[in-house]
C-alpha cells in the first residue's frame, strides 16, 4: 500500500521517479480504508531532503500511511522556502488536540549544543510530553533519541571527543523481538553524531530493551517495553550521498573531518559511495509501522488509551 501525501509536495515527484507507490490525497479520499496517521516532526535544516528520505522508508509497507509534516516553530528557515513550510507543514497548536498512530522526530545538527541552549527545547519537551497521551508509538532518530532519553529518563548529554561518522556493523541482540523481525544477525547502518550511547550506561540507568549495538557506535536501537518509544541513534534514512555531502560541508567550513568510516571505496572520497544499509532501513520502518503502530493502535483514534498497549 502507498503513503498518502499532499498533491504538490516536492517529494512526490522524486518518489514516483523511483517507482515508489505514492497516493495523492485526491485519490486516497475515495478509498474506504482507515490509513495510519503518522506525523513527522522535521528538525533538520534541509527539510525537503529529509522529508523525502523518511517518506521513502515509510512507503515500503503493505499499510496505507497518511503522513503529515510538523514544524517546531514559525521561525524563518535558511534552507527551506517559506512557501513550502506554510503550504505543507503544520503548527503544533493546530494538531495538539488530535491523536496519531505514529510520530517520527528527526535528528538535528545540535550535537555539541546543551539541551537548555537549544532555542526550541521547551517547545520540543511540550511535544514529547503531548505524545504520551496522543500517539501510539514515537520513533526518535539520532539527536532526537538523545533528547527523548533526557525527557523520559533524565539522562544527561554524553558527548564523544570526535564525531562518529561512517557506516558501522551492528549486532542483532534480540532476534525474536518484533522490531528486529527479519533482521540479519549483523547489519550495516550509518551514523553521524557526537552523542555517546553506551550500552552499559543505558542498561544501568533505564529499563529499555537494548536491541542492536555496534562495537564502535554503541547502542543503535532500543525500545521501551511497550514499544511506544523507539530510539534509533543512527541515520537509516540517509541517502547514499548524505554522508558525502556532510563531509564536503565540514571541509568547506574549514574543519578537519575524518573520512566517513567504511563508506567510500578504498576510503577515497573521489570515488562515489554506495548505500549498503538501504534494505535495513526499509525493514526497520516496516517493522515499526506494523508491530509498534498498526498492531497496537485503536481503530478509532478518538478511543486512544494506555490500555491498548502491551509490554510483550
Swiss-Prot record:
Family matches, as Pfam families: HTS (PF04204)
Active site positions, chain numbering: 142 (acyl-thioester intermediate), 235 (proton acceptor), 237
GO biological process, any: L-methionine biosynthetic process from homoserine via O-succinyl-L-homoserine and cystathionine
Catalytic activity: L-homoserine + succinyl-CoA = O-succinyl-L-homoserine + CoA
Keywords linked to the UniProt accession: Acyltransferase, Amino-acid biosynthesis, Cytoplasm, Methionine biosynthesis, Transferase
Site (Important for substrate specificity): 192
Gene Ontology molecular functions: homoserine O-acetyltransferase activity; homoserine O-succinyltransferase activity
Chief location bin: cytoplasm
Site label Important for acyl-CoA specificity, positions: 111
EC number: 2.3.1.46
Residue ranges crossing the lipid bilayer per the database entry: none
Gene3D superfamilies: 3.40.50.880
Pathway in which the depicted protein is active: Amino-acid biosynthesis; L-methionine biosynthesis via de novo pathway; O-succinyl-L-homoserine from L-homoserine: step 1/1
One GO term describing the cellular component: cytoplasm
Entry annotated with the keyword Magnesium: no
UniProt subcellular location: Cytoplasm
Binding site for substrate: 163, 192, 249
Its job: Transfers a succinyl group from succinyl-CoA to L-homoserine, forming succinyl-L-homoserine.
Entry's family note: Belongs to the MetA family.
HAMAP family from the UniProt entry: MetA_acyltransf (MF_00295)
Protein name: Homoserine O-succinyltransferase
